[in-house]
Amino acid sequence: MRLIRMLLPVLALTTLTAHADDKDVARLTQLLETSKTLTANFSQLTLDGSGTQLQETTGDMTLQRPGLFYWHTNAPAEQTMVSDGKKVTLWDPDLEQATIKKLDERLTQTPALLLSGDVSKISQSFDITAKEAGGVIDFTLKPKTKDTLFDSLRLSFRNGLVNDMQLIDSVGQRTNILFTGVKANEAVPASKFKFDIPKGADVIQE
């Protein structure tokens, strides 16, 4: 399974408190709710616990509340992941294979839903702290349960728009995602979140 799948099945600060700060939760919720749709390009870098690069990819994404997302990773590790709000389709053109599964609405299992899902559930799922410097607001999210894809997630905003995301897993592997060309609240066609599986492709239902 490719490392890119860690983010979407398709994104730490050290000063933490034991419980979510109400002001930090409210601020993060406001920033997220302001963007009903998001489009952006991204570059993703994954490092192991010692800092060795494991993978570097680029691509583009489109998100829309509630629960809709399109995430395309460019070649050579090309993949497309699309959610219609109920199910997620992962298309691997190299394998000519489509994997279809029910959308896991838990924010700790599907980080993309932090940007496209029900933000009212954030404080139920995470302890949250915020830090602001140089016009950038960093939110650190620590899952409240152990059954998660990551141990820590940092979400950063610049000028009111998401700027980057970092996930750290239990073995110290880091996935850093930088978003560029971010645009919010532009009209997105419904067809963006529907994936037509090519004829003859292998289909796996999970």
Curated annotation (Swiss-Prot):
GO biological process, one term: lipoprotein localization to outer membrane
GO cellular component term, pick one: outer membrane-bounded periplasmic space
Segment forming the signal sequence: 1-20
Subcellular location: Periplasm
CDD domains for this protein: LolA
Main location: periplasm
Keywords, ordered alphabetically: Chaperone, Periplasm, Protein transport, Signal, Transport
Gene3D superfamilies (alphabetical): Lipoprotein localisation LolA/LolB/LppX (2.50.20.10)
Superkingdom of source: Bacteria
Family to which this protein belongs: Belongs to the LolA family.
Function noted in UniProt: Participates in the translocation of lipoproteins from the inner membrane to the outer membrane. Only forms a complex with a lipoprotein if the residue after the N-terminal Cys is not an aspartate (The Asp acts as a targeting signal to indicate that the lipoprotein should stay in the inner membrane).
Family matches, as HAMAP family: LolA (MF_00240)
Database matches in PANTHER family: OUTER-MEMBRANE LIPOPROTEIN CARRIER PROTEIN
Quaternary state and interactors: Monomer.
Protein name as it appears in the record: Outer-membrane lipoprotein carrier protein
